[in-house]
């Protein structure tokens, strides 16, 4: 990524996080914008979100984000339009790193427990 796309991605991550926190306060799962990846032409921004909750809550949250993408983009546009000629299209994707890390931690605990029992 070029320096410009990195700066744009960082700005979008901050602004999207603020929008989701202020404009869409929701009870339920914790939602965090973990990373934003943007295409070289600045036309598409993929926002990776971490959702801490059960499977149903995560699915509902992703459905909500996908349904509200146009409204979120409109709010984003009003906040950063003075910095960009064109606001990138938004795409939300779930970041499963937290779940993968939890699963690895769980596996490590079970291995430690088994090795402790076998000694």
From Swiss-Prot:
Q: Which GO terms describe its biological process?
A: maturation of SSU-rRNA
Pfam families linked: RBFA
Keyword hit for Cytoplasm? yes
Question: From what superkingdom does this record's organism come?
Answer: Bacteria
* GO cellular component terms given for this protein: cytosol
**Could you tell me the keywords of this UniProt record?**
Cytoplasm, Ribosome biogenesis
Instruction: Return the PANTHER family for the record.
Output: RIBOSOME-BINDING FACTOR A, CHLOROPLASTIC-RELATED
Q: How does it assemble?
A: Monomer. Binds 30S ribosomal subunits, but not 50S ribosomal subunits or 70S ribosomes.
Recorded family membership: Belongs to the RbfA family.
Please explain the role this protein plays, according to its UniProt record: One of several proteins that assist in the late maturation steps of the functional core of the 30S ribosomal subunit. Associates with free 30S ribosomal subunits (but not with 30S subunits that are part of 70S ribosomes or polysomes). Required for efficient processing of 16S rRNA. May interact with the 5'-terminal helix region of 16S rRNA.
Q: What is this protein called?
A: Ribosome-binding factor A
Organism from which the protein derives: Chlorobium phaeovibrioides (strain DSM 265 / 1930) (Prosthecochloris vibrioformis (strain DSM 265))
